[in-house]
């Protein structure tokens, strides 16, 4: 198992910008508070201090490997400030603040797919990317404190969103920390979800395919009740052909063999149908949708459906 040690320093404590229909702040890393990388906090102009709000959290997805940290920071800032992106769109529509972490995805250690929270990422020890899932929770706690100091009333649980690699991150994160997530929104998922089972057809499913070695990887037992009850909106475009299962950074050869032979070699409809069926069989409180004539994108139609889903579930 490769280990990655990243030395990252910054003299920026808070950097604000207010020309994007809101205010974005780059919050410096704070290892004493539990996170080794900075994050962006976006407060849309629609956010009101006289009502209770949720913190939207969307993991960053650079889309490529790089050992230049500024590449990841630039892409994370775009996620935070561009309303084409899912998290920013929802922040404006709901009037909720948005957190985007700046986790690296290294080129030298390219098999550690941090932005998808893969097995390699979860097994890191003794370096700056150890347990980035816990670092993300620490960032959220830090952001909530800042927002409270500004006069906002913040709900305890987060709204977790993601698309493509960050959608996979969101799905896996929700399986690990279901009690921290009020609602999970995830799409562009390669037709593959973490399945809430130890095995299928006598084939063991370890993380991130299933939950067989969940305690070994996460340090906690899988909370089946909390995961089952957490509202989730999980979607694929019918024309989506972006299949991470083909690549060595997303899955190793053993994982790929299981995916192809047990879950489905064809991303759609076979693999996605199997994932959907497993979630329905387990009784997950999820809306699982396939959108016709849509590829690998969170289209306007999808965004509107997500907005309706969030409004229905966050008022309960």
Predicted segments with their positions:
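A domain-start/cap signature at the N-terminus of enzymes
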Residues: 17-56, 63-71, 88-97, 158-163, ...
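C-terminal catalytic histidine-bearing segment of alpha/beta-hydrolase fold enzymes
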Residues: 270-316
């Amino acid at each position: 198992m490769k280990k990655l040690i990243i030395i990252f320093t910054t003299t920026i404590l808070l950097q604000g910008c207010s020309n994007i229909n809101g205010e974005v702040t780059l919050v410096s890393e704070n290892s004493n508070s539990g996170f080794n990388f900075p994050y962006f906090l976006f407060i849309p102009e629609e956010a009101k201090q006289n009502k209770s709000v949720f913190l939207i959290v969307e993991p960053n997805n650079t889309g490529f490997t790089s050992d230049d940290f500024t590449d990841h920071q630039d892409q994370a800032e775009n996620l935070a400030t561009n309303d084409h992106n899912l998290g920013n769109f929802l922040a404006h529509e709901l009037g909720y603040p948005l957190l985007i972490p700046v986790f690296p995805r290294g080129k030298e250690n390219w098999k550690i797919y941090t932005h998808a929270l893969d097995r390699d990422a979860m097994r890191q020890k003794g370096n700056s990317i150890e347990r980035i899932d816990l670092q993300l929770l620490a960032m959220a706690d830090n952001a909530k404190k800042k927002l409270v100091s500004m006069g906002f009333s913040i709900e305890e649980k987060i709204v977790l969103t993601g698309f493509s690699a960050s959608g996979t991150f969101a799905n896996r994160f929700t399986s690990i920390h279901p009690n921290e997530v009020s609602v999970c929104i995830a799409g562009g998922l390669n037709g593959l979800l973490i399945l809430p089972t130890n095995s299928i057809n006598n084939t063991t499913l370890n993380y991130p395919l299933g939950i067989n070695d969940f305690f070994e990887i996460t340090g906690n037992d899988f909370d089946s009740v909390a995961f089952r009850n957490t509202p989730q909106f999980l979607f694929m475009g019918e024309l989506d052909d972006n299949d991470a299962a083909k690549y060595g950074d997303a899955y190793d050869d053993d994982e790929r063999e299981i995916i192809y032979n047990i879950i489905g070699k064809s991303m759609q409809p076979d693999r996605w149908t199997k994932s959907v069926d497993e979630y329905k069989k387990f009784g997950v409180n999820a809306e699982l949708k396939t959108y016709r004539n849509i590829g690998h994108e969170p289209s306007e139609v999808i965004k509107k459906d997500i907005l309706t889903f969030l409004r229905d579930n966050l008022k309960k």
